[in-house]
Amino acid sequence: LEKKCSTSHQFQKRKCLQPIWYVGYVDLLCHCCYDGSKINLGFKYVNIFVTNPDPHKSATELPDKHIVKMPLETCQMLSIIYSKWYYDWGEIHKKDGTPYNTEKGAFRNHPCTKWAADSIFNTAWLIQHGCALSDEYSYRYGKLHGCHKALFEAKKTFHRCAGEVITCYCMVE
């Protein structure tokens, strides 16, 4: 859903009219207003932070602290979506080979998880965003993110189980 950012620019004393994007109930500001101040980075919540409908552009526009944290939250969401709670496609494995724990279904009722599981197009967008976050991490820090392997495992599982290839992001609901 596209809306306009209504944040006042402190340095210009005017209302910003740039587009912003919403996923689930997550309210994001446009790129020029976004500083991460409204975001809870704790492990208690998972979120999807979207600054652009293109998953790759959205990843490049996020600040460093989100590039570090968001691949893990993406893996946590995808592991719930792939588990018995939604698609029942199997497990996603951490860097050490152990699967993400989905037994209790943590985050399964979170609005962002529900959004991502609502259609394969939403799931595809989240996977591409997670992979783009991991790539952006590599670009900024010169090393692979700990979730890199899990994200690409999720992508391969998606191709195998959904019977779809992730190529179009404009189909996100």
Where are these regions (language model features)?
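Charge-dense polyanion-binding interfaces
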Residues: A124-H159
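Cysteine-centered motifs
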Residues: C5, C16, C30-C33
